[in-house]
Amino acid sequence: MTNIVFMGTPDFAVPVLRQLLDDGYRVVAVVTQPDKPKGRKRELVPPPVKVEAQKHGIPVLQPTKIREPEQYEQVLAFAPDLIVTAAFGQILPKALLDAPKYGCINVHASLLPELRGGAPIHYAIWQGKTKTGVTIMYMAEKLDAGDMLTQVEVPIEETDTVGTLHDKLSAAGAKLLSETLPLLLEGNLAPIPQEEEKATYAPNIRREQERIDWAQPGEAIYNHIRAFHPWPVTYTTYDGNVWKIWWGEKVPAPSLASPGTILSLEEDGIVVATGSETAIKITELQPAGKKRMAASEFLRGAGSRLAVGTKLGENNERT
């Protein structure tokens, strides 16, 4: 039987690991990122993949730097015939890439060569795409640049968020892997090189990218909000204080004003001018130091002092 080492870290990777086990493959070890401190008490929390592996009694390795010989040699000690990765979070060294009989394959959440990198789901929505997908490909030393084995398209709905699309792609990736592995192990797949000139990139999200730029068209701001929902969440500022913007809707602008201007205060939201004739109605927000709430609740309380004509985003420095 084929010895498989699975490498993955976040929730996205869990259905992929489960699929391997459900299909009866022998997963001899799981490699994931180290536990991380979270919350106010900074208690160490294990990655979701570690939790899943421990449910099945699978040995778990948590290297801090997989490219260090003493760390990747622990993986090689399990004599993998195949390494399967899904959102692992570290680039593998050549010694690992070359070792398995069937190679190293990766489940990547985009239609490669588009959206290489660590945040392809965010960028697919942020860029207003109507479809994305999953690619299973051989791993190479260059990030997400290996030859492709299989691919499946997944439509992006108008109301999809990074959360809903994440779950769709994770499920699609698990199913695609289930269909791909028998063909790979039987030698019935012809790898397809990626077209480098068509490559685009989706690097990890930076904190400053969470800020809403009200000068952008309303459609782009709507895509930004849903691309960052429910993590890491967009924000704007009002009177020097941060407002996290959890959700908003596109609405026709009732009047023209400079971007960021509050155009109207409605029962269910705050309508804000953008760089186009499409305004954004903020329907769910989290003012600094407060809980997440519906805009209607906010407007009945602390937001009752808001006035039409006030500007959002004047102080763009996040505190």
Curated annotation (Swiss-Prot):
(6S)-5,6,7,8-tetrahydrofolate binds at S110, L111, L112, P113. Keywords: Protein biosynthesis, Transferase. It catalyses: L-methionyl-tRNA(fMet) + (6R)-10-formyltetrahydrofolate = N-formyl-L-methionyl-tRNA(fMet) + (6S)-5,6,7,8-tetrahydrofolate + H(+). GO terms for cellular component: cytosol. PROSITE patterns: GART (PS00373). One of its GO terms (molecular function) is methionyl-tRNA formyltransferase activity. Pfam families: Formyl_trans_C, Formyl_trans_N. Its EC number is 2.1.2.9. CDD domains: FMT_core_Met-tRNA-FMT_N, Met_tRNA_FMT_C. It comes from the Bacteria. Belongs to the Fmt family. Attaches a formyl group to the free amino group of methionyl-tRNA(fMet). The formyl group appears to play a dual role in the initiator identity of N-formylmethionyl-tRNA by promoting its recognition by IF2 and preventing the misappropriation of this tRNA by the elongation apparatus. PANTHER family: METHIONYL-TRNA FORMYLTRANSFERASE, METHIONYL-TRNA FORMYLTRANSFERASE, MITOCHONDRIAL. This is Methionyl-tRNA formyltransferase. It comes from Geobacillus thermodenitrificans (strain NG80-2). The lineage of its organism: Bacteria, Bacillati, Bacillota, Bacilli, Bacillales. The gene is fmt.
